[in-house]
Every structure is written in structure tokens, then in C-alpha cells.
């Protein structure tokens, strides 16, 4: 792809998201979603291949369906209230449709089927944009309409997402699919707490984006996309491999790493609201995520997959890819837990 065209597409992608985040008018938000989608599809096709074509087609169909549902919800709300303002969502039908549309855009269960398939068909850098930046616009709308969303529908989808995110990643060997299922589970955690404490959702989103950015940057540094290639990185880049394992455990929510903090604070907030069964279910289901991350860490750290001797010592040049933000991202991804008391005061 021509670098100038790529920069224009990237600028349009950023502008579309910013338009959704900053607008208080439904039409402007919808236009922002469309700008974002139309700019992202050519970025997915940057390296043309049948898999990229399939992934971008799936992405287009799901996002177009979600946009149509969103516009239908806006029109129903307009008919009943005469309001274009995002925060004034009064009609229950419009609220339910809006929740479903945004759930499709976020990839919440049971509308999650496109996320692993699309993530697997695109390069690591594009996958990073899909699982981080592309979550900002739908979550910002959910944040604004959180007082009027259908609570039971939202909580059902959130719990399903946590369950699917744990189960789906259990038998995966492709790292991009594992990250996709992890994203589904994290979105479940964020949307569970949204009706009770939206600020906590933003904190969870910030930590999730940092951890996902760190993981993808580490994968890009080593050019690893499968568990087999990850298990063979210890003799090429031992420090990066160690940091990869730490970040994986943090994503699984293992204390005393940063990933444990949002889970702890969400469970604490739910128990403060006298909700006991749901956080218990969430904590037990989170063990599924932790299990496949620990299995991945174990296979990377202690064992080698069956391979011939000449595969064990992979020859290559020293890594020359620059990643200036990586050290900071690793520190935030693994060492944020001691700041929990300060952050809980702010929340």
C-alpha cells in the first residue's frame, strides 16, 4: 500500500473514533462509526491475501449490521422522544436495540463469532488496532447511555462473554485467536461493571489496552504467531521471552501483577452493591482464562515442543525493530498493583 494512502486512512480512522467520542448528537456519532469502518477495511487489506479478504468481508458484514441496528434504534428513539441527544435514550425498545448493536461492534457474546476469525486473518499490527483502538468508540457510547441501558440484557451478555472468552481460548494454538478470546473476556468484565460504576470501566479499559499493546508489541518483536514459535524464542531473545510470560500472566489476572487490579476492584464494587452470586461466577470463570495463559507460559518457559535439533537453535539477525513505548507499557502492564489504594480513592 502507498504510504500516503495509508496515512490518510489512519487519519480517517482516528478522526472517526474521535468524532464518536466527542459528539453528543446521534447522527454525528453514526457518521463517525461509518468513517472508522470504511477507513479500517482497507487497512486490513494492506497485505492482500485470501485470508485478509475473508477477514475484511466478515468485518464489513458484522459492522454494517450493527450500524443498521444502531440507526434503527436512533430513529425509534427520535419518534418517541424527538431527541437527537445521545444521553437522552428513553424508549426501552430503542435502548435494547442500541445495546445489541454496540455489543455486536464490541464483539460481546453471543455476537462474538467474528472476533477470533477476523483477528486470525489479519497481521499483528492490524490485529492490535482491532482489539484496542476499535473498542473505544462503542464503549464511549455505552458509557454515555449507561443509565438507560437494559440492565439484565447487558449483564447476561457480559457474563456470557466472560464464559466464552475463557472456554474459547482453551484449545487454541494461534496467539492471535488467544488474544481475541481474551479481548472478549475483558469486554465482559468491563460491561459488567458499567451500570454500577462507569469510571471503573474506563480504568479497566486503560489497563486492558496497555496489556494488549504490550503483548502484541512483544509478538511483533519476535514475529511469533503460534505457541510453537513462542516456545522457540527463549534462545533468540531471552529477556523479551521472560517479559512476554510476565505480561501473559498479568492478562490472566494473576496477583501481584497489574491485571489482577481491575478484577479485584470490579468484584469489590459488585459486593458493595450487595451482588454476590455474579462476582463469584465471574471469579471462577476467570480461572479458565488464567489456565490457558499459565499453560502458554509453562510451554514457553519449561518445555520445548517436539522438534528436530536444527530447529532448536534458530538463526537470525539481532532484533532491529524499534519499540520506544514498550518498556513503559511493560512496567504499567506488570507493576501497577501497588497503586490500587490511590486509584480506588480517585474512583
From Swiss-Prot:
Membrane-spanning residues: 1-21, 25-45, 59-79, 96-116, 122-142, 149-169, 200-220, 239-259, 274-294, 325-345
Record has Nucleus as a keyword: no
Keyword list, A-Z: Electron transport, Membrane, Mitochondrion, Mitochondrion inner membrane, NAD, Respiratory chain, Translocase, Transmembrane, Transmembrane helix, Transport, Ubiquinone
Cross-referenced Pfam families: NADH_dehy_S2_C, Proton_antipo_M
Compartment annotation: Mitochondrion inner membrane
Entry keyword annotation includes Nucleotide-binding: no
Catalytic activity: a ubiquinone + NADH + 5 H(+)(in) = a ubiquinol + NAD(+) + 4 H(+)(out)
Cellular component per GO, a single term: mitochondrial inner membrane
Chief localisation class: mitochondrion
Main EC class the enzyme belongs to: translocase
InterPro entries reported in the protein's UniProt record: Complex_I_Subunit_2, NADH_DH_su2_C, NADH_UbQ_OxRdtase_chain2, ND/Mrp_TM
Stated role: Core subunit of the mitochondrial membrane respiratory chain NADH dehydrogenase (Complex I) which catalyzes electron transfer from NADH through the respiratory chain, using ubiquinone as an electron acceptor. Essential for the catalytic activity and assembly of complex I.
Subunit structure: Core subunit of respiratory chain NADH dehydrogenase (Complex I) which is composed of 45 different subunits. Interacts with TMEM242.
Family: Belongs to the complex I subunit 2 family.
Name this polypeptide is given: NADH-ubiquinone oxidoreductase chain 2
Amino acid at each position: 500500500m502507498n504510504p500516503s494512502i495509508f496515512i490518510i486512512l489512519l487519519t480517517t480512522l482516528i478522526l472517526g473514533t474521535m468524532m464518536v467520542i466527542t459528539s453528543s448528537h446521534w447522527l454525528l456519532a453514526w457518521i463517525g462509526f461509518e468513517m472508522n469502518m470504511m477507513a479500517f477495511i482497507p487497512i486490513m487489506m494492506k497485505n492482500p491475501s485470501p485470508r485478509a479478504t475473508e477477514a475484511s468481508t466478515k468485518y464489513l458484514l458484522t459492522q454494517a449490521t450493527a450500524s443498521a441496528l444502531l440507526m434503527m434504534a436512533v430513529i425509534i428513539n427520535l419518534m418517541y422522544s424527538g431527541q437527537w441527544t445521545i444521553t437522552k435514550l428513553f424508549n426501552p425498545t430503542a435502548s435494547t436495540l442500541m445495546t445489541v448493536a454496540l455489543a455486536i461492534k464490541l464483539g460481546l457474546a453471543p455476537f462474538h463469532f467474528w472476533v477470533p476469525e477476523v483477528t486470525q486473518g489479519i497481521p499483528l499490527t492490524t490485529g492490535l488496532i482491532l482489539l484496542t483502538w476499535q473498542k473505544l468508540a462503542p464503549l464511549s457510547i455505552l458509557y454515555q447511555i449507561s443509565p438507560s441501558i437494559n440492565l439484565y440484557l447487558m449483564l447476561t451478555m457480559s457474563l456470557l462473554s466472560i464464559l466464552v472468552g475463557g472456554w474459547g481460548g482453551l484449545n487454541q494454538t494461534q496467539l492471535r485467536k488467544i488474544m481475541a478470546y481474551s479481548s472478549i473476556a475483558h469486554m465482559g468484565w468491563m460491561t459488567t461493571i458499567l451500570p454500577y460504576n462507569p469510571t471503573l470501566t474506563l480504568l479497566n479499559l486503560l489497563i486492558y489496552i496497555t496489556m494488549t499493546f504490550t503483548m502484541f508489541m512483544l509478538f511483533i518483536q519476535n514475529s511469533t504467531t503460534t505457541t510453537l514459535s513462542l516456545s522457540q524464542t527463549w534462545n533468540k531473545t531471552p529477556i523479551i521471552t521472560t517479559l512476554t510470560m510476565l505480561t501473559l500472566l498479568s492478562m490472566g489476572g494473576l496477583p501481584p501483577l497489574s491485571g489482577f487490579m481491575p478484577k479485584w476492584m470490579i468484584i469489590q464494587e459488585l459486593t458493595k452493591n450487595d451482588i454476590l452470586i455474579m462476582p463469584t461466577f465471574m471469579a471462577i470463570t476467570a480461572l479458565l482464562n488464567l489456565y490457558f495463559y499459565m499453560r502458554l507460559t509453562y510451554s514457553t518457559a519449561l518445555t520445548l515442543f517436539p522438534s528436530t535439533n536444527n530447529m532448536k537453535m534458530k538463526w537470525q539477525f539481532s532484533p532491529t525493530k524499534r519499540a520506544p513505548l514498550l518498556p513503559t507499557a511493560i512496567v504499567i502492564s506488570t507493576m501497577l498493583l501497588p497503586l490500587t489504594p490511590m486509584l480506588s480513592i480517585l474512583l
